[in-house]
Amino acid sequence: MKTLLYSRNGRADAVLEFRDKPKPVPQDGEVLVKLEASGVNPSDVKSRAGRPFAFDFVVPHSDGAGIIEAVGPNVDGARVGERVWVWNGQWQRQYGTAAEFIAVPSAQAVHLDDAVDFETAACFGIPGLTAAHAVNLLATTKCERVLVTGAASSVGHYVVQMASMEGKQVIGTASEAKADTVLEAGASSVIDYRKEDVGEKILELTDGAGVDAVIDMDFYSTSRLVSSSALRSHGTIICYGSNDMGEIPVAFRDLLFKSLTLKFFLVYELLEHERSAAVERLGAFMQSGKAKTRISHVLPFEEAVKAHELVESGNANGNVVLKV
């Protein structure tokens, strides 16, 4: 089968190459998926660029969609021919979705309705499940107003839609060029984080009340809200990333005396019940008829280098997907 792989870290144009590899055979509890689309996420390009790996080569990408071609032992044969989307395809595995086929545990191939195309479904795994779990966590808090950072990102765009559908007043951060995208997704206001002080603008937009929660993609930047009245007492920060992965100082006094809650999660490591709940929310969201998946580029498999470069540039206004 045709596969995209890298055997060392580096620039996309220097390390990505196509190779022919044996078609996988589904093992006990697995399904073999003939892939139609492979989603390219920021975590995929970061892994290729510089994260150590334990294999002699890696076939990248965790998200994808296609059709089940075969099943291994202890999997219902009725699944053959089923349209599915795949999550965690390459998490702690050698073979991801940048290939013509992938064998994964049956639970990692989720049923896909006929109404949803493969390119859209290839955006569900990391962006969709991250957003769904974040909003599930939000649902456990008393929240009327929520700040969504990176609201024009693939994850943030889903979060804005889901939270606004739940009746929350959503304030998003985004560049001026992407503000309309965030407003169309359901945000009441957009803060240009490049030109405006986020904390001060929150207070202005809420008449000094602040927000009850933050769903955050970059704790390095957002941590300063811990000590700001822009985040109300008894507020919650739900965080799934940070541009600085080192030590980030926060004022314990403010955490304590404001009775703040910090919730962090990695979408790859959700507990089984958390994953199931996220899949359920994402499915309901997609069936609502209101869901919007913003796809910036759909490229042929042969243009994988360009896809990685687009994601790395930050200039893609939406998801980047490869047709396999």
Language-model segments: residues:
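NAD(P)H dinucleotide-binding glycine-rich loop of Rossmann-like/cofactor-binding domains
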Residues: 15, 88-150
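Glycine-rich beta-strand-centered segment in the early N-terminal region that forms part
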Residues: 22-40, 49-90
